[in-house]
Amino acid sequence: MDQSKMEFNQNKRTISWVHLMPFALALSVAACGNGSGPATGGGSSGGGGKTGTGPTTGRLLDTAVSGVGYAASSGAAANTDENGIFKYSHGDTVEFKLGGLALGKVKGAGIITPMELAGESANKLQNLLILLQSLDIDGNPDNGISIPPSAAAAVATSINLDSDPAAFAASAELQKAREAGGVSGAVKTANQAKAHFLSQGIPMLSSSIWVKHDDTSASVIRISTSGGGEYLNGEATPDDSCDANRVCGGKLVSKAGVEYGVAGVSEFDTRGFKFVSKPVIDTNLQAGLSNPRATVRVRTDGSDLINSDIVTVQREKKQASLFGELFHIAGTLEISSDKEPIKTEIKESRYSAMENEPKGIIGAWAADQTNIKTQTYFFFSNGKFMMVDPVGNPEHAENCGPGVEFASYTYDAGSKALSIKGFTYDTNGCAGFSETGASSFNLNVDGNTATLEKQDKSKISLYRVSK
């Protein structure tokens, strides 16, 4: 059996809706429990997007892949278009094919990539990348992948997507399909295909602003859409003295605060991309994006940002009897054998796309339209407000540094009156609204710009950055 498939099959995939834990700790807390965040399901909007109904569309991406056949369980069937778009209905399964070769059958989602189509097979993931990129008519996947109908029709059902990638790239079946489609140039090597897919990691992850929040805490991630990896992260979550393995001590490990820096992806597997970051500003210690575990992977299905980790399954402890506790009667101490296999499972937690009301206050707003390193304001539909501030007030840096605010708000769309009060978190001192509150929020007609006036009559021009 293929070693990569053996390793993946040893893992049990479970989804854990761990709300509002700092990004770097959420997965380990999901595995071990006893975290400092709110209880699961405790808010009006947490990780995980809302379930939709009816017809919708998704995109097949390495870069956009056109010319791949698809069939949705509700009946929609065609080829992906030049933007990689396919049609399906919420709740569908969708099967993708090239000619008679089944590429994979998956649950319909806003974004489907070879990671989803590959299931748990590392070889299949690599070979799908080689196949799609090598059938691109102009040989340049950077401008999209366009597979000619004649090439797709010539893809043989005998092609083994689980074979060794080097052998797959050299296979006669792949070359025949390329010749049938008039595709010139060389077949993409495994390294070339991998490098290109890695280059798409940050653009995929920046498709939305990602949030987890409830009535007591919030965590937000914004990655620049320019592709350069610039990011802003805010954590309004409780102080925690436990590390990612839930080993606790007297030293504070994570706290509410802000991160700003540059991020990238260094590798990938069937669970997602390995996220790496270089923070320039980091006031939240090990919370946020600056200290991910080595086994954490991140991907997006278009609606959610999905974080997963491989964790050790904790052995269940037998409950001692009351009699045994009282009289200190214990059985033989059970020692696990060195030969006993270590059981692991995959734990997942999710951020949802920031909600957005096109003609209302709900959404994300930034003080600078083009920069990520700017004060950013989040108005949630549950009446909660968060400010993520990577700059503070430079004129009073000692008391007004970078940080976050989390509070309640009320807004009257008729009078434009805005009130922000009841601050649960305030780590940027005098730089935000905790000392000089808001008085009005005046939306412009287009809904994309607004003027926020503070109680001291100073005004802030804001730009909608959620969508």
What are these regions, as identified by a protein language model?
Residues 49-169:
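Beta-strand-dominated extracellular/periplasmic modules and repeats
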Residues 16-26:
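Sec-dependent signal peptide recognition
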Residues 43-69, 202-206, 354-361:
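N-terminal low-complexity, Pro/Thr/Ser-rich intrinsically disordered segments
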Residues 129-203, 295-315, 319-320:
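Beta-strand-rich cores of mature extracytoplasmic or soluble domains
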Residues 2, 25-54, 467:
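Bacterial Sec-dependent N-terminal signal peptides
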Residues 1-15:
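N-terminal secretory signal peptides that target proteins for export/translocation
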